[in-house]
């Protein structure tokens, strides 16, 4: 008889222990360190950052990535364990992966009563581009970034679901997507994504720096091949015809400092959309500098809009250009981007 009463008590004990453990993890920061960032210098940079975190009295635990996209898996697992506060130690790719790991957990079929707004993301910038950091207004200096985390000051930002479809009909009608990703900053289709393909390939070969983006951009402009597509914003067609590149974002900076969506606001619930039509090379040469000055929105030939959802529909299979999200190529058009109802907490 005593044994029969002991089993329920043991179960209750373990249940309470698990609940206490999860509550503890919800208040503890988890630092996901991309040891491959900054030409593999992130490991030594992290050692200094760890000391500063401890000196600032920040309660944290660290886990280290083992390869490309590993931060996505680590953040998904950590979210399932109960962690709700994440520090991405790396560049834009690390931020993208951490967000996607969190989102995968939140939107998985077996997850209930968990929202994006339950999570907080902080960043210690260690990378070459750091475009999200510039868009969000987070200091690039590591000491200052840690001071911001210690201050506890947070805001919110929009998160965008990007869905790749087999056909244009599926994209318009909301059919089953063949691939999905979540965006924290800026994405693009066409020339923009081709630049990312080159940059990512060069990074894998060890190249770094802002010049990498500029040289890739100039190469893609020189070898540009305009394609045809339609663009729908909240169901209304805003563009149809030949284009060179498209950008969509909740942030302002991409490609190492370019501002294709130079008026975007990260928490207004809207996507900023910029379509660059097929224009002569001389016009491109004249207007490209404005990408870096913040005046690109003043270029008269652009089609620009703000909306909650964007659908890009290529006219034919040969017009299906690559799609990039936060610098990562995720597939080819047709594609739909939509701002989620729930927002993510960010340390700013």
Model regions and ranges:
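ATP/NTP phosphate-donor binding region
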Residues: 14-89, 96, 100-107, 143
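Catalytic core of DAGKc-family lipid kinases
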Residues: 56, 104-244
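Glycine-rich phosphate/pyrophosphate-binding beta-alpha loops
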Residues: 188, 192, 247-260, 329
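ATP/nucleoside-binding phosphotransfer catalytic cores, i.e., glycine-rich phosphate-binding loops
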Residues: 233-235, 240, 259-260, 265-348
């Amino acid at each position: 008889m005593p044994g029969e009463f002991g089993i329920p008590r043991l179960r209750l004990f373990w249940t309470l222990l698990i609940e206490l453990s999860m509550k503890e993890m919800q208040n503890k920061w988890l630092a996901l360190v991309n040891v491959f960032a900054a030409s593999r210098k992130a490991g030594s940079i992290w050692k200094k950052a760890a000391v500063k975190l401890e000196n600032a009295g920040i309660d944290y635990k660290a886990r280290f990535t083992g390869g490309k996209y590993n931060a996505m898996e680590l953040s998904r697992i950590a979210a399932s364990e109960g962690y709700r506060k994440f520090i991405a130690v790396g560049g834009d790719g690390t931020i993208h992966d951490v967000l996607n790991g969190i989102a995968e957990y939140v939107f998985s079929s077996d997850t209930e009563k968990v929202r994006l707004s339950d999570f907080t993301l902080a960043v210690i910038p260690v990378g070459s581009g750091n475009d999200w950091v510039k868009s969000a207004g987070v200091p690039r200096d590591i000491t200052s970034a840690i001071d911001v985390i210690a201050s506890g000051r947070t805001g919110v930002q929009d998160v965008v679901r990007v869905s790749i479809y087999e056909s244009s009909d599926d994209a318009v009608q909301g059919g089953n997507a063949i691939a999905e990703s979540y965006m924290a900053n800026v994405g693009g289709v066409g020339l923009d994504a081709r630049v990312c393909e080159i940059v990512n390939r060069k990074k894998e070969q060890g190249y770094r720096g802002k010049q990498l983006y500029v040289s890739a951009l100039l190469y893609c402009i020189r070898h540009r091949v305009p394609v045809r597509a339609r663009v729908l914003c909240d169901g209304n067609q805003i563009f149809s015809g030949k284009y060179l590149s498209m950008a969509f974002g909740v942030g302002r900076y991409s490609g190492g400092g370019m501002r294709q969506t130079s008026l975007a606001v990260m928490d207004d619930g809207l996507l900023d959309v910029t379509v660059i039509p097929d224009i002569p090379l001389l016009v491109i040469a004249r207007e490209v500098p404005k990408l870096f000055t913040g005046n690109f929105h003043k270029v008269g030939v652009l089609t620009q809009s703000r909306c909650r959802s964007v659908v890009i529909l290529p006219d034919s299979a040969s017009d299906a250009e690559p799609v990039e999200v936060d610098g990562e190529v995720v597939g080819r058009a047709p594609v739909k981007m939509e701002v989620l109802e729930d927002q993510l907490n960010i340390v700013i």
